[in-house]
């Protein structure tokens, strides 16, 4: 799926699915970097909330994370690709996206992430969320699906996505609720957010 098609899907439905956003060799390279960084102790348990109120709650969120940087060639290439997508979305949708942040996420067997929105109630800067999967040979029985809901109150998912390597999911951070179902094996991904200036900053 082209960047233009991702923009069209976001405008029409609030989410987009790009099954072959990265090639298998690119996925393998990023997974290798993630495994190496985890082996050197760079991952830590994720928290929910932000600031002083952030807390660890494995019943709600069970992943370990590590923020991407530009120390390796695979990470630099991916961040450049995300930057190109950010620019394309700005051209097509006039979103005013100004920044990007991204981290690896590793869910152990039996862990998931309860239904939530990515935009914090007291921080409106997250505009578009991205999820890129790094798993190899993911099978139907492995679980770990991402379920997207068209609104915060929707009862049934609009889309259920298997976390197959190379697949990219883009969604609106403010309206598309989502959850990660528990997996039966380790589940690897990269989560990223395209950010804009806050409404409060824009009024200054």
List the predicted regions and their residue ranges.
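Fe(II)/2-oxoglutarate oxygenase catalytic core
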Residues: 1-129, 133-168, 174-204
């Amino acid at each position: 799926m082209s960047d233009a098609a991702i923009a069209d899907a976001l405008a029409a439905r609030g989410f987009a699915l790009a099954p072959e956003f990265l090639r298998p060799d690119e996925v393998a390279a990023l997974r290798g970097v993630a495994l190496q960084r985890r082996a050197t102790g760079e991952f830590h348990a994720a928290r929910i909330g932000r600031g002083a109120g952030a807390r660890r709650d494995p019943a709600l969120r069970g992943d370990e994370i590590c923020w991407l940087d530009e120390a390796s060639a695979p990470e630099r290439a991916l961040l450049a690709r995300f930057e190109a997508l950010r620019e394309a979305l700005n051209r097509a949708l006039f979103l005013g996206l100004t920044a990007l942040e991204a981290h690896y996420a590793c869910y152990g067997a039996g862990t998931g992430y309860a239904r939530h929105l990515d935009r914090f109630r007291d921080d409106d800067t997250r505009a578009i969320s991205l999820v890129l999967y790094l798993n190899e040979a993911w099978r139907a029985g492995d679980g770990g699906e991402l379920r997207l809901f068209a609104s915060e109150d929707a009862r049934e998912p609009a889309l259920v996505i298997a976390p197959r390597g190379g697949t990219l999911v883009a969604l609106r951070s403010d309206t598309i609720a989502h959850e990660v179902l528990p997996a039966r094996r380790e589940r690897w991904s990269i989560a990223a957010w395209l950010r804009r200036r806050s409404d409060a900053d824009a009024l200054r």
